[in-house]
């Protein structure tokens, strides 16, 4: 009976200590992030909830940047440069 009372007391204490939302409260109602002291892997801090807590948002919720499309190869290939060097060496070596 004492053991059962001890278990119930421990469970009651744990419900007060462990947060139900997985480590943090929601940042803002329209933001899909949580206020935490450290962000998990795969998350980034968008802004500060309080002086010690960051609003951590998963990378999957962030917009992807629009990168410019590259046309063609802007850098000369290494094989082309080595061909030029080989031609120069052949012309200087031959008497």
Curated annotation (Swiss-Prot):
InterPro entries: Beta-defensin (IPR050544), Beta_defensin_dom (IPR025933). It holds the Pfam family Defensin_beta_2. GO terms for cellular component: extracellular space; sperm head. It is found in: Secreted. GO terms for biological process: defense response to bacterium; innate immune response; killing of cells of another organism. Residues 72-95 are annotated as: Disordered. The keyword Oxidoreductase does not apply. Disulfide bonds join 27-55, 35-49, 39-56. Keywords: Antibiotic, Antimicrobial, Defensin, Disulfide bond, Secreted, Signal. Residues 1-22 form the signal peptide. Has antibacterial activity. Belongs to the beta-defensin family. This is Beta-defensin 132. It comes from Macaca fascicularis (Crab-eating macaque).
